[in-house]
Amino acid sequence: MGPVGIILIVVAAVLVAGGFVAMLIFTTPIAKKVYRDQLVRTSPDKWGRVCSCPENEEQQAMWDAGIAWAKPRAGRKTNVEIENDGFRLVGEYYDFGHDRCAIILPGRCECLIYSYYFAAPYEDADFNVLVVDTRCHGESDGIYNTIGVKESGDVLTWAKLMHERFGNKEVWIHGICIGTSSGIFALTSPDRPDYLKGLVTEGCYVSLRETFKRHMMADKRPLFPVLDQVMWQINKHTGTNVYRQKPIRQIKKMPADCRVLFLYGKQDIFSIPKKSQKLFDACSAKDKKLMWFAKGGHSHLRINNIESYDRAIFEFFN
């Protein structure tokens, strides 16, 4: 190749590199905004104790039904709080006179009032119930969502409170979407106590990047390079590496003595069936069960299948 050819290649490389840099200059502010909108509590009112999506009829119905469940049980409620990682975290404990407790971990944007809706099947299955404002939600402290990684320490601290203060011999986790990620990291932690027994998961994703991609696709947003720029923002602000710290990888470390019930919907467009099956297959717990529901979108399985959803939980434990 002659000098002219070499010069042309160099010029082309410079133009391509320059174009890529120009693109990043344009897309970086977009990625920062997406990150702040979706995963950062930018004001005290954000992710407060309100219905996160009142325009969605099913979401509002779940909210109303949860409040209807909690109201007549107010006499069984104890307001509780813990401190972990320097954050004050709050919850409500409902004592039904049993020796085991279910901690309900809601998805992103949701507070403990949302979790009331999932408490009913546990009351019926002879559990006490703890609902919590996860960090940076409701009345709990915090700004950044760490995708379940540091929240897992919060879960372990809640479990310790349930065991030591309230005498629960067993503590179980019910996780919805990202709440399951916190549960998986807690159960696979070297600090997991013997009384933390297992998990019921609804709609858990294989990785945050995978489900975030599907949310962006549903919103008809361009993926490249914004998707991975958002993942970089997560790492920059929280230290979480979503490429390595993800449920599909962590669940392979699930202790053999844990029990896990997977609840998934065939209509879920964010935790799609093919990926959900992979998560179940990867789980190293000896006692695991997978149940599919034909109807119901992401995090909306119970409202579309109340009888069979509640029965699945009851039969898993009884």
Can you say where each PLM-predicted feature lies in the sequence?
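Alpha/beta-hydrolase active-site loop
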Residues: 145-166
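Conserved alpha/beta-hydrolase
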Residues: 119-141
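Conserved alpha/beta-hydrolase "acid-adjacent" motif
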Residues: 243, 269-275
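An N-terminal hydrophobic leader/cap segment in hydrolases
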Residues: 12-82
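The serine-hydrolase catalytic nucleophile loop
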Residues: 108-121, 134, 274
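Short beta-strand/loop motif that positions the catalytic acidic residue
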Residues: 254-256, 262-264, 268
